[in-house]
Amino acid sequence: MRPSGRTASQIRPVTITRQYTCHAEGSVLVEFGNTKVLCNATVEEGVPRFMKGQGKGWVTAEYSMLPRATHTRSGREAARGKQGGRTLEIQRLIARSLRAALDLKLLGENTITLDCDVIQADGGTRTASITGACVALVDALTYMRSKGIIKTNPLKHMIAALSVGIYEGTPIADLEYTEDSEAETDMNIVMTETGKLIEVQGTAEGEPFSFEELDELLKIGKHGLRELFDIQKAALA
């Protein structure tokens, strides 16, 4: 039995609120149960030096957690003068995932930065960030078209992400913190709405897992991701 009483494949209630702040070209508050992440998309002219002259755009991301997003206060990384390895890993994952959603040639030499700030953490912050940031990205692209910055929508497909894992011997979807901290296996799946995989990150925290368990994790992950795509589309309707 899961602590929340959810079934093995049941995801938490998910809410996506668009235009959450007034300044960003795309702004979304995404909630997976008690996990809440603010995803803001900023459009800027120009690209990083290594991209100049290629006629393509760029998508990058930054990720952070507010000091009291967790049970105990964590100090601001800015105060320490450097980002931690976990933060760097997560923001690279977010950026890689979102770049896979676009035809960068159609973006022109423009950069979109996704800032994902965790307001409250209860597991699955990186997957919530990707799912919410994709909606913020769509709104930023709409803004760019309305201002004549781009002529054609570069979006190839929506993307979303979901955590899965093995908890007390059972494959489950969308782990909350109490499950994540005790899971025997922890995995994140990033997928396109067409059913293709962008990234699968999986680690046996305790007992190694079998190929049969891997297949089951991918199966319940795909089922949950289908629900997330429906929620994204409803938010954008």
From Swiss-Prot:
<keyword id="KW-0548">Nucleotidyltransferase</keyword>
<dbReference type="InterPro" id="IPR002381">
    <property type="entry name" value="RNase_PH_bac-type"/>
</dbReference>
<dbReference type="GO" id="GO:0016075">
    <property type="term" value="P:rRNA catabolic process"/>
</dbReference>
<feature type="binding site">
    <location>
        <begin position="124"/>
        <end position="126"/>
    </location>
    <ligand>
        <name>phosphate</name>
    </ligand>
</feature>
<dbReference type="GO" id="GO:0000175">
    <property type="term" value="F:3'-5'-RNA exonuclease activity"/>
</dbReference>
<dbReference type="GO" id="GO:0000049">
    <property type="term" value="F:tRNA binding"/>
</dbReference>
<comment type="subunit">
    <text>Homohexameric ring arranged as a trimer of dimers.</text>
</comment>
<keyword id="KW-0694">RNA-binding</keyword>
<keyword id="KW-0698">rRNA processing</keyword>
<dbReference type="GO" id="GO:0008033">
    <property type="term" value="P:tRNA processing"/>
</dbReference>
<dbReference type="InterPro" id="IPR036345">
    <property type="entry name" value="ExoRNase_PH_dom2_sf"/>
</dbReference>
<dbReference type="InterPro" id="IPR050080">
    <property type="entry name" value="RNase_PH"/>
</dbReference>
<comment type="function">
    <text>Phosphorolytic 3'-5' exoribonuclease that plays an important role in tRNA 3'-end maturation. Removes nucleotide residues following the 3'-CCA terminus of tRNAs; can also add nucleotides to the ends of RNA molecules by using nucleoside diphosphates as substrates, but this may not be physiologically important. Probably plays a role in initiation of 16S rRNA degradation (leading to ribosome degradation) during starvation.</text>
</comment>
<keyword id="KW-0819">tRNA processing</keyword>
<dbReference type="GO" id="GO:0006364">
    <property type="term" value="P:rRNA processing"/>
</dbReference>
<keyword id="KW-0808">Transferase</keyword>
<comment type="similarity">
    <text>Belongs to the RNase PH family.</text>
</comment>
<dbReference type="Pfam" id="PF03725">
    <property type="entry name" value="RNase_PH_C"/>
</dbReference>
<dbReference type="GO" id="GO:0009022">
    <property type="term" value="F:tRNA nucleotidyltransferase activity"/>
</dbReference>
<protein>
    <recommendedName>
        <fullName>Ribonuclease PH</fullName>
        <ecNumber>2.7.7.56</ecNumber>
    </recommendedName>
</protein>
<feature type="binding site">
    <location>
        <position position="86"/>
    </location>
    <ligand>
        <name>phosphate</name>
    </ligand>
</feature>
<dbReference type="InterPro" id="IPR027408">
    <property type="entry name" value="PNPase/RNase_PH_dom_sf"/>
</dbReference>
<dbReference type="InterPro" id="IPR020568">
    <property type="entry name" value="Ribosomal_Su5_D2-typ_SF"/>
</dbReference>
<dbReference type="InterPro" id="IPR015847">
    <property type="entry name" value="ExoRNase_PH_dom2"/>
</dbReference>
<dbReference type="InterPro" id="IPR001247">
    <property type="entry name" value="ExoRNase_PH_dom1"/>
</dbReference>
<dbReference type="InterPro" id="IPR018336">
    <property type="entry name" value="RNase_PH_CS"/>
</dbReference>
<keyword id="KW-0820">tRNA-binding</keyword>
<dbReference type="Pfam" id="PF01138">
    <property type="entry name" value="RNase_PH"/>
</dbReference>
